[in-house]
Amino acid sequence: MSEIIRVPDIGGDGEVIELLVKTGDLIEVEQGLVVLESAKASMEVPSPKAGVVKSVSVKLGDKLKEGDAIIELEPAAGAAAAPAEAAAVPAAPTQAVDEAEAPSPGASATPAPAAASQEVRVPDIGSAGKARVIEVLVKAGDQVQAEQSLIVLESDKASMEIPSPASGVVESVAIQLNAEVGTGDLILTLRTTGAQAQPTAPAAAAAASPAPAPLAPAAAGPQEVKVPDIGSAGKARVIEVLVKAGDQVQAEQSLIVLESDKASMEIPSPAAGVVESVAVQLNAEVGTGDQILTLRVAGAAPSGPRARGSPGQAAAAPGAAPAPAPVGAPSRNGAKVHAGPAVRQLAREFGVELAAINSTGPRGRILKEDVQAYVKAMMQKAKEAPAAGAASGAGIPPIPPVDFAKYGEIEEVPMTRLMQIGATNLHRSWLNVPHVTQFESADITELEAFRVAQKAVAEKAGVKLTVLPLLLKACAYLLKELPDFNSSLAPSGQALIRKKYVHIGFAVDTPDGLLVPVIRNVDQKSLLQLAAEAAELAEKARSKKLGADAMQGACFTISSLGHIGGTAFTPIVNAPEVAILGVSKASMQPVWDGKAFQPRLMLPLSLSYDHRVINGAAAARFTKRLGDLLADIRAILL
């Protein structure tokens, strides 16, 4: 049978600033249903039972009071109700502190005379002593109503609105934004309109309230600092340890941050001293009375009684650990971040700093939707980062956009996905690898004669023997002879990773862009096997049937433009490889043999290399040896 879950006793009314559940949700005992905010505190209202939400009776912005319906709940079988006191105090630590620090206008002054000027002063703001004006809500000439907020103050423990004690017209405002004010400081002068004024003078509060008992002086020597009363939460998790052994701390300096299912709170030091040892660890569960640390305090003079209503008076030295204060993550300008426990937990799960999030809730409060929107924006930004990096060159000033249409007719043709990926990879390699290119010409007159002589044998085997298999075989031989060319730079930049295998990629020009299939174990295959595999991979690349795994794992790359033309070019190293061989069109050239010029078929070679790994002499030796091998391929057999 369904049950209506109602607002417990919250000491007044509150505005719904967050809905934490929706129809159909399966909820647990003590799971938050809504977050309410009153003039003095914000609090989560938990569910007293587990079950399924049948309907939600409230919406954002609703004003709720004790007994108002929140949801209709279909209890789970055998679900036990939560303790009554837990329901009655939805957010004990947060509410208790905020109420303790918030002013109570009805308990601190004598009534103002009707139809007369009245000075409105800062009421007793408790142990905070001083607070900063973070909002001024009225100006001279404004008509205000009794209980209308005049300013918003923020101390290190709470933020609070100061209400008007009576209706009237603001004659003058005595404070400014960001000013530090204390109990009894003048806020404004109000000309009342004959309504019964509410008390404001702080002296009355001081007279009505008994002075606190004198506090004992802090004795010199070690003192155990324990977890104070953390209310109905019972246990809380240590989410931050702010000090370590040997640290010098001041009185009221935060030591640890605790979090329960209802609130986050900082535990301050009761006295100044040096931390001797820390007894708690990150993520430990602690409760009231558990030891936090041992503090060696210096002897201090006893503090006398302090009248809470006296402005400008120094705070008494604490004799026991004070009540924990709600945590607000500091924003960039030093202000506190306002968010409920559920929102803080969500932010931690995403690894997000609350201070970086723009708030959309009432009075600057961060909502779950704000966290989700921030995470979504960051993910989109990360997704666009590679493209942005490729466009701008990772810090290099980008080329300014040009409106080409003003010069004549244009057509914008989208790049294929393959072209986009290739552009990003090539740009990354160009930016990260210090390129140098070594040029050489190889005499392949005899090699070409050998290739032509073997055409019939190759055709009988069903393959076409081109120069590429011969280049693959010669390069594989050199990669084993000169192992630095068959390596990659370690991520640390302090070592080389030498590969014991010889996999070589070769560039294939396709209608959609450049592809580089990889032939594995080139050193272990015959010329005819290499010719067959190269032809098969090239066909797959052109017909879009080449798998991703067929383009991975290369140690070295050959890019041949011999079938097109050209005398030389500077290929880009395919990182993390350290070298790439460019091959241009062979041509007959006159070569001096010591007696006369002889016609020889010369093949231009262009070796680009990573200068972090390969030096110029090594590159020259590589191209020289490659030229020798191509001039007499029989040397490979030795």
From Swiss-Prot:
It is an enzyme of class 2 (transferase). GO terms for biological process: pyruvate decarboxylation to acetyl-CoA. Its EC number is 2.3.1.12. Residues 90-119, 201-220, 301-336 are annotated as: Disordered. The modification N6-lipoyllysine is found at residues 40, 157, 262. GO terms for cellular component: cytoplasm; pyruvate dehydrogenase complex. One of its GO terms (molecular function) is lipoic acid binding. The active site is at 611. Residues 338-375 form the Peripheral subunit-binding (PSBD) domain. SUPFAM superfamilies: CoA-dependent acyltransferases, Peripheral subunit-binding domain of 2-oxo acid dehydrogenase complex, Single hybrid motif. Residues 90-117, 301-320 have a biased composition (Low complexity). It catalyses: N(6)-[(R)-dihydrolipoyl]-L-lysyl-[protein] + acetyl-CoA = N(6)-[(R)-S(8)-acetyldihydrolipoyl]-L-lysyl-[protein] + CoA. Its cofactor is (R)-lipoate. CDD domains: lipoyl_domain. PROSITE patterns: BIOTINYL_LIPOYL, LIPOYL, PSBD. The pyruvate dehydrogenase complex catalyzes the overall conversion of pyruvate to acetyl-CoA and CO(2). It contains multiple copies of three enzymatic components: pyruvate dehydrogenase (E1), dihydrolipoamide acetyltransferase (E2) and lipoamide dehydrogenase (E3). Belongs to the 2-oxoacid dehydrogenase family. This is Dihydrolipoyllysine-residue acetyltransferase component of pyruvate dehydrogenase complex. It comes from Azotobacter vinelandii.
